[in-house]
Amino acid sequence: MTYDKRLIVFDWDGTLMDSIGRIVSSMQNTAQHVGLPVPTDVAVRDIIGLSLEPAIEKLFGLLNPVELDGFLVQYRDEYVDLNPTPSPLFNDAKAVLSQLTDSGFELAVATGKARRGLKRVWSESETEHYFATSRCASETRGKPDPQMLYEIMDELNAHPEETVMVGDSVHDMKMAIAAGVHPVGVSFGVHDAERLREAGAALVVDSLTELSDRLIKERP
């Protein structure tokens, strides 16, 4: 039996929203505030896509509970309220989401953000209505574990062969492969095309418009 692609699952940060600079500077500002070594831009970019606590451990080692709680509170304040770095949607994001839904695709989000963070950016960007469902790292196992994708496919009655995972990081590609879905990378986020292909991306696109054009063209 063959399956047509009908479900497209998007990562959020660096895929639909140009938020990488804000994440990097927020992590660095938080480290400085709590007295930890300030990580490089490259080091922070490499953990984007992971849920927050594993990302912190990868950057700073295992913190004790008091240190971790203090870091989490400061980081969330920094990212949401204190950091002036803009984090807009990519210019073609809304048009692409509209084109894909109009063409009959179901859309979903699988993100390392907490639910509170996703709801906030959905409200700010007025995009929640495009998505049939979503999973956040705060409510299931985080990337690159495939559990997010399993839960999304189960809820929407989609087979892996019908599903595309779109993301900007190697964590997205590894999750997609583990779940048996089609891994598609975008080259304008945290990891470049070469790293995405090395991680298993079957296709790497240079814009969301290119992604939409390819998917709609290949739809029966």
Q: Where are the model-predicted features located?
A:
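A metal-dependent, Asp-based hydrolase signature
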Residues: 48-81, 94, 98-101
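Glycine-rich phosphate-binding loop signature in dinucleotide/nucleotide-binding domains
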Residues: 2-3, 102-105, 156-162, 218-219
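Short acidic-hydrophobic, aromatic-tinged amphipathic segments that line or gate anion-handling sites
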Residues: 203-207
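Short, acidic loop-to-helix structural element flanking the phosphoryl-transfer center
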Residues: 4, 81-109, 115-122, 146
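Active-site neighborhood of HAD-like aspartate-dependent phosphohydrolases
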Residues: 1-46, 62
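Substrate-recognition "cap/lid" segment bordering the active-site pocket of phosphatases
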Residues: 85-88, 114-165, 170-179, 193-197
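Hydrophobic alpha-helical segments typical of transmembrane helices
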Residues: 26, 40-43, 51, 55, ...
